[in-house]
């Protein structure tokens, strides 16, 4: 159990640092008007999770420490649902219902599709 906790912790650290770096980069490129960084990390994380889980299912074990490190750890630390909800709420509070709908719909629909695509390609 301790080994699993440490693997998730290390992976979460890596994923969190990557998420922060990409969010800062995207804010610098696109400006602060739309949370592109969070959208990109959530979609990329969904795809990566599907790929990783499929590859471990095909070539290894989805119960392995490496799978835990990469999925629950790195992908879990990389993606961020709480930030997604907070940014969505801010759009509503700032009078941007169109941005809210676009962001929520794109995140959910594309997230599910990309996870499934990653899984199907690499299984």
What is the predicted role of each segment?
Residues 1-123:
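Membrane-interface helix-loop junctions in multi-pass transporters/channels
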């Amino acid at each position: 159990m301790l080994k699993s906790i440490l693997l998730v912790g290390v992976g979460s650290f890596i994923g969190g640092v990557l998420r922060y770096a990409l969010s800062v980069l995207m804010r610098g490129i696109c400006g602060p008007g739309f949370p592109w960084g969070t959208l990109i990390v959530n979609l990329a994380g969904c795809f990566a999770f599907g790929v990783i889980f499929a590859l471990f299912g095909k070539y290894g074990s989805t119960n392995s420490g490496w799978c835990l490190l990469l999925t629950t750890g790195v992908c879990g630390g990389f993606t961020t649902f709480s930030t997604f909800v907070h940014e969505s709420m801010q759009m509503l509070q700032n009078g941007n219902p169109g941005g809210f709908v676009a962001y929520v719909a794109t995140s959910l629909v594309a997230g599910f599709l990309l996870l499934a695509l990653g899984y199907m390609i690499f299984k």
